[in-house]
């Protein structure tokens, strides 16, 4: 007997927004900025919301099961936050509630009695925005919109030279994993099977090519290229209405023209700045100037380590980004 999970069950949360982008694009920085707008709960990170969409895409879980679980995870996480449960209190985590100017509000919730009816009303309030920061979610946005039709996504873009260099600094793309520390370094998220060990899910379209790459920097460039390609194809496959629910934002614009970027975000989300926004901007050292000379040094370092084929791929990606301010 076939069992299906319902995808019609109503959710508690009615106003969900996701900050998305490639790894090292500055999403948590953006999450802190957006959390300074009115009627927005300080952002959360959920590894389950990161994993489920691509596992459904690759057939590891049925779509109805994934949708049902995605909705349950959002509702549970937001419910827990509303009563002060499972708060991230680690000081040096970017998603720690101590990064919120009203962190005491969240701590107070954990000490207070709560009225279930009022909690449900709060979660269901269409003017109350609940914010999550995720990775590479645009690549699987179709299932996210199936789960949350009113979802809004703010996808953060960044110069690919900065991305590649940052991945190099993090030692991503290792050819051999010689220890559990190496394994942890590539992330503990569910990986697909490769000939010689686990591989990141997003390389599945180029799995054979990726495994044949013996240069770590080449692997990083190939990874970033395929993620961008997956995001682009998924975006173009969405209906016009869903495309309008996605905002593209450049990291460089956010850093250098912070107030203008905040105004654009506010309009997209239908809210406005809280009284804490100026404090947050100052704390994040914005607005600031991105030094072109530093990017030149990064580019030279990358080009000195990558092979010609992947140097050309990076050059193509960067030229498109500089000319169009996006990859789409």
Predicted features along the sequence, with ranges:
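PAPS-dependent sulfotransferases, especially Golgi type II membrane carbohydrate sulfotransferases
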Residues: 1-18, 195-328
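Short beta-strand segments
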Residues: 21, 131-133, 155, 248-251
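Walker A (P-loop) phosphate-binding motif
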Residues: 7-35
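PAPS/PAP-binding and catalytic site of the sulfotransferase fold
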Residues: 26-39, 144-148, 167-168, 248-273
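Long, charge-dense
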Residues: 174-203
């Amino acid at each position: 007997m076939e069992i299906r999970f319902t995808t019609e069950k109503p959710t508690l949360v009615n106003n969900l927004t996701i900050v998305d982008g490639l790894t090292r694009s500055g999403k948590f920085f953006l999450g802190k900025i957006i959390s300074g707008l009115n009627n927005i709960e300080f952002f959360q990170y959920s590894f389950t919301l990161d994993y489920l969409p691509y596992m459904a895409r690759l057939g590891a879980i049925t779509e109805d099961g994934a949708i049902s679980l995605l909705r349950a995870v959002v509702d549970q996480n937001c419910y827990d936050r509303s009563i002060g449960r499972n708060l991230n209190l680690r000081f040096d985590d970017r998603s720690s509630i101590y990064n919120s100017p009203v962190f005491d509000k969240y701590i107070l919730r954990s000490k207070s009695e709560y009225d279930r009816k009022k909690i449900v009303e709060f979660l269901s309030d269409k003017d109350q925005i609940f914010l999550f920061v995720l990775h590479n979610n645009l690549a699987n946005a179709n299932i996210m919109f199936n789960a949350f039709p009113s979802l809004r996504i703010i996808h953060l873009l960044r110069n690919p030279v900065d991305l590649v260099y940052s991945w190099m600094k993090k030692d991503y793309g290792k050819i051999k994993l010689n220890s559990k520390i190496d394994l942890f370094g590539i992330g503990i998220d569910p990986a697909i099977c490769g000939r010689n060990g686990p591989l990141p899910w997003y390389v599945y379209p180029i799995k054979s090519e990726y495994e044949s790459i013996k240069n770590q920097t080449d692997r990083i460039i190939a990874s970033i290229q395929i993620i961008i390609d997956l995001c682009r194809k998924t975006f173009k496959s969405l209906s016009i209405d869903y495309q309008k629910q996605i905002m593209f934002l450049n990291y460089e614009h956010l850093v250098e023209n912070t107030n203008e970027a905040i105004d654009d975000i506010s309009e997209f989300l239908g809210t406005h700045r809280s009284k804490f926004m100026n404090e947050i901007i100052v704390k994040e050292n914005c607005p600031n100037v991105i030094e072109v000379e530093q990017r030149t040094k990064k580019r030279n370092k990358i080009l000195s380590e990558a092979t010609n084929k992947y140097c050309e791929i990076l050059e193509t990606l960067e030229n498109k980004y500089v000319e169009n301010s996006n990859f789409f």
